[in-house]
Amino acid sequence: MERAIRNFLSQESAGGILLMVSVVLAMILANSPLSGMYHGFLETEMQVRVGNLDIDKTLIHWINDGLMAIFFMLIGLEVKRELLEGALSSRAQASLPTFAAIGGMVFPAAVYLIFNYSDPITQVGWAIPAATDIAFALGIMALLGSRVPVALKVFLLALAIIDDLGVVVIIALFYSTDLSTISLIIAAAAILGLIGLNRKGVTSLAPYGVVGLILWIAVLKSGVHATLAGVIIAFCIPLRAKDGSSPSESLEHSLHPWSTFIILPIFAFANAGVDLSGMSLSSLLSPVPLGIALGLLVGKPLGIMLFSYIAVKLKLAVLPEGMGWRHITPVAVMCGIGFTMSMFISSLAFVGEGQMYGDYARLGILLGSIASATIGYFWLSKVLPEKGAKA
């Protein structure tokens, strides 16, 4: 188990660094003479037609609806494994990160709404600062190397996974519109098919892939966000086969490098290109970017720490062995790194009439995430023992 966690962390950490490069490259292109080419490329129309089925979307929508469905399937596989056999499989292990994650979603949303309560158009962005980018957070933590105890990394990992699960629920409940009854019926039939495969003990991944593709298309056409199909597919794939092997973990290991080194960097490159040419200090201090930035930088750690403290004081949870509040606090600050997850929610929240707020939202995400990463890194570096020293 410990070796699996270390492998996961090392891969996610490298991915976090690659994500940073993707964000910087997107920002450079979006604010250079090549900005027209950059945005034009992302708006390229791509059509898939099979018989009467016709899916016509821009490249950026294929990335957000298609590639990110694979990423969310990976999240689903991780959540299922952790719930059944991992860091969330017992109440004692799951309690603290669960309370922390709840606080870390409630408080950022509240901070955002404080700044945007009077505007119904911008109110829909309340969930943007509620997300944590696990790859970025682990990438920043990895810069401290072996000084970071595994227990602290596992706490961050568990918290971020629960946070991701919360984001999935938020997307399903609040960012699905114009529902198609026929597509929902087809999606329900596909889900029943996946459950049937699981119940019959089918361990081959091919049938899940075929039915899963049908589910993704149905969900895409239904008005519910297509990424949720990935989570449903993941939950239906068996964790253990009769011979002791794990189809779920096998798929998880196969998807990790694709997600870490291809899907998330592409998503970041496509969504992080904020045009700063028309921005000013007043733009930065407008309700949307200010609410998001402070939600990530202030609301996130405040919610995590307050809910964690209350849970420990009420004996509903315990701190990880060898860890104190001085260790948990900078990790809570690091959880304010929203980046790709926050940008994803932003792409769902600000559409149609609110599309003009997209760049403002991304600016707030970048500022809040960078500040959280910087402060969290130096704070954690200060409280951890020097390499070779004892804690």
Curated annotation (Swiss-Prot):
GO terms for biological process: regulation of pH. It is found in: Cell inner membrane. GO terms for cellular component: plasma membrane. It is a multi-pass membrane protein. It comes from the Bacteria. InterPro entries: Na/H_antiporter_dom_sf, NhaA. The chain crosses the membrane at residues 14-34, 59-79, 95-115, 124-144, 154-174, 177-197, 213-233, 261-281, 292-312, 331-351, 363-383. It catalyses: Na(+)(in) + 2 H(+)(out) = Na(+)(out) + 2 H(+)(in). GO terms for molecular function: sodium:proton antiporter activity. Keywords: Antiport, Cell inner membrane, Cell membrane, Ion transport, Membrane, Sodium, Sodium transport, Transmembrane, Transmembrane helix, Transport. NCBIfam families: NhaA, PRK09560.1, PRK09561.1. Belongs to the NhaA Na(+)/H(+) (TC 2.A.33) antiporter family. Na(+)/H(+) antiporter that extrudes sodium in exchange for external protons. This is Na(+)/H(+) antiporter NhaA. It comes from Shewanella pealeana (strain ATCC 700345 / ANG-SQ1).
